[in-house]
A protein has these predicted regions:
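Short coil-to-helix segment of the ABC ATPase nucleotide-binding domain corresponding to the Q-loop/switch region
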Residues: 6-14
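Conserved ABC ATPase signature
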Residues: 47-51, 55
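Hydrophobic anchor residue at the start of the ABC signature
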Residues: 61
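A short, proline-enriched helix->beta-strand linker immediately N-terminal to the Walker B motif
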Residues: 66-70
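Catalytic Walker B motif of ABC-type/P-loop ATPase nucleotide-binding domains
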Residues: 72-75
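Helix N-cap at the start of a conserved alpha-helix in ABC-type nucleotide-binding domains
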Residues: 83-85
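H-loop/switch region of ABC-family ATPase nucleotide-binding domains
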Residues: 107-108
């Protein structure tokens, strides 16, 4: 959940300060780093309502990246996005995973699964099943 009364920079600053960061220059540098990583450079003074849905989602991902997590859990991260924004989020997750962070995503969007095949697990009648999506799709 984004803080609607704070701009992009302040949303990220809040998380860093809440997790123990104290040095203002280090905070500023870390914010610049994650904004660059998620493609929101020059948006630091925009309010959340001034961002598109895709940009808001990128800001949420930036918040998740601030403290260099080993795992990101994403629940329907492309659910309310147009196809172009959805594709951008999926490409961003692929880049994040390529940098060594595991991304676990819950989705009902079969198009994303088809376009970005990877290890896929589904819940079926209370059971967890791993699906070989690559062979199913013929890749």
């Amino acid at each position: 959940q984004l803080l609607t009364d704070r701009n992009v920079f302040q949303n990220l600053q809040f998380v860093l300060k809440a997790t123990g960061w104290k040095n203002d220059m280090e905070i500023k540098n870390k914010i610049a780093e994650v904004l660059n990583e998620v493609g929101l450079v020059n948006k630091e003074y925009k309010m959340p309502f001034q961002l598109s849905g895709g940009e808001q989602q990128r800001l949420s991902i930036a918040r998740a990246l601030l403290n260099n997590p080993q795992v990101i859990l994403a629940d329907e991260p492309t659910g309310n996005l147009d196809p172009a924004a959805s594709d951008g989020i999926m490409q961003l997750f692929r880049a994040i995973a390529g940098n060594g962070c595991a991304v676990i995503m819950a989705t009902h969007n079969i198009g994303n699964i088809q376009q970005y095949p990877s290890r896929t697990i589904r819940f079926n009648q209370g059971q967890i099943e791993e699906i070989d999506i690559v062979s199913i799709l013929g890749y």
